[in-house]
């Protein structure tokens, strides 16, 4: 990654605190992590809608969606996966600075990468949501047919099958998508946000 000594950071005259005050809530990254098929996208879509309906400034970044544009030049090697998360972390930080409750849904299999995003943000601005679901259940669901392709060898380095997933050890929130409904999971997250005075 090239760096230049000729680049200067320009501060805005509108602060993050001012934006949060105008929005009537704090800003943070609500970072969903979990296996493919665990329900990250499904629950994050429902959460974004609930926050929006409650009048909150919110935006969702989805793993598949960003690979159509921002990260379309990245593959799925360990290095590219890490770069994928690094870029998303930087975008999420900008959105937090803009005062938004930023919902992200990425497998983000490596603990080091997730902690790297946490380190970009101020204290309490990174809310890790572990979307807990067994490989067996994820494979049973297989909404995109990816597990079938991974088992046949069509997709190498597939998280949970032929590539590792490092589950969070101390996430702020764990949702049990194998047993709880979408509504229950969203309710659990909203409750956390209210109890910790984000909203």
UniProtKB/Swiss-Prot annotation:
Disulfide bonds: none annotated. Keywords: ATP-binding, Kinase, Nucleotide-binding, Phosphoprotein, Transferase. InterPro entries: APS_kinase (IPR002891), P-loop_NTPase (IPR027417). HAMAP family: Adenylyl_sulf_kinase (MF_00065). Belongs to the APS kinase family. One of its GO terms (molecular function) is adenylylsulfate kinase activity. Catalyzes the synthesis of activated sulfate. CDD domains: APSK (cd02027). Pfam families: APS_kinase. It catalyses: adenosine 5'-phosphosulfate + ATP = 3'-phosphoadenylyl sulfate + ADP + H(+). The keyword Acetylation does not apply. One of its GO terms (biological process) is hydrogen sulfide biosynthetic process. Its EC number is 2.7.1.25. Residues 1-22 are annotated as: Disordered. ATP binds at residues 34-41. This is Adenylyl-sulfate kinase. The active site is at residue 108. Pathway: Sulfur metabolism; hydrogen sulfide biosynthesis; sulfite from sulfate: step 2/3.
């Amino acid at each position: 990654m090239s760096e230049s000594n000729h680049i200067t950071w320009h501060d805005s005259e509108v602060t993050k605190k001012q934006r949060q005050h105008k929005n009537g809530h704090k800003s943070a990254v609500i970072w969903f992590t979990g296996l493919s098929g665990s329900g990250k996208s499904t629950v994050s879509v429902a959460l974004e809608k609930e926050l929006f309906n409650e009048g909150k400034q919110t935006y969702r970044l989805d793993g598949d969606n960003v690979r159509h544009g921002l990260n379309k030049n990245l593959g799925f090697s360990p290095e590219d996966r890490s770069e994928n998360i690094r870029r998303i972390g930087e975008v999420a930080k900008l959105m937090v600075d803009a005062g938004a409750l930023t919902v992200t849904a990425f497998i983000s299999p490596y603990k080091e990468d997730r902690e790297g995003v946490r380190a970009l943000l101020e204290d309490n601005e990174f809310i890790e949501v572990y979307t807990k679901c067994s490989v067996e259940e994820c494979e049973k669901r297989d909404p995109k047919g990816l597990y079938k392709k991974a088992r046949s060898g069509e997709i190498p380095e597939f998280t949970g099958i032929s590539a590792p997933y490092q589950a969070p050890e101390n996430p702020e929130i764990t949702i049990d998508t194998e047993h709880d409904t979408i509504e229950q999971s969203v309710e659990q997250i909203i409750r956390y946000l209210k109890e910790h005075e984000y909203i």
